């Protein structure tokens, strides 16, 4: 079953166009979203969250159109980026006290568990956090209101290899509990470890949406890694 669907989503800028983007997120699966910088990954994600207005197409979650059901849908999804841009001089404790008032499903036990798991100090302020810890703070908020779908933009950015592996293990645990994850990243080696499906975007268009093993078999050469396949496809597209 699909818990999120994009159908012919378009967004036009003076120098860039998101062109009829279509793919779906399968329940309880991790979908890797790959593409070079400027390919349209972040524009697609912002469209999925209604942070920008699309020029056309439809986005649905849980069978409901995002247009007209945004408030209800956003109670059931979580979003994380590699940056923290709000309340930079408030403490984590103060930010959380405000944030949880917006989520009736806020799980204080889960919050405390992930706070310890990520090694975050509630007395710290976002401006005092490393880039890696900012990523963890975003994830902490997304995981603490029992989100059924996680939309993650570069969630392993700024993390050391050990922390990245810990996070990938966590994603596996969440998947086992039925959580659906969209994992947008340029670190394709992470996706080789955890992704069930791959969405490949180039120049604003979806070039492939396939199960990971099928994507690698259909586009790869013997012995190539996902990263090597991606790099070669990009070079061929520019040739």
Region spans (language model):
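Helical segment within the ABC ATPase nucleotide-binding domain
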Residues: 164-177
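Conserved ABC transporter NBD signature motif
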Residues: 57-68, 72-73
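ABC-family P-loop ATPase nucleotide-binding domains
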Residues: 81-138
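ABC ATPase "signature
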Residues: 209-210
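Conserved beta-strand
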Residues: 6-9, 16-26, 33, 57
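Catalytic Walker B motif of ABC-type/P-loop ATPase nucleotide-binding domains
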Residues: 150-154
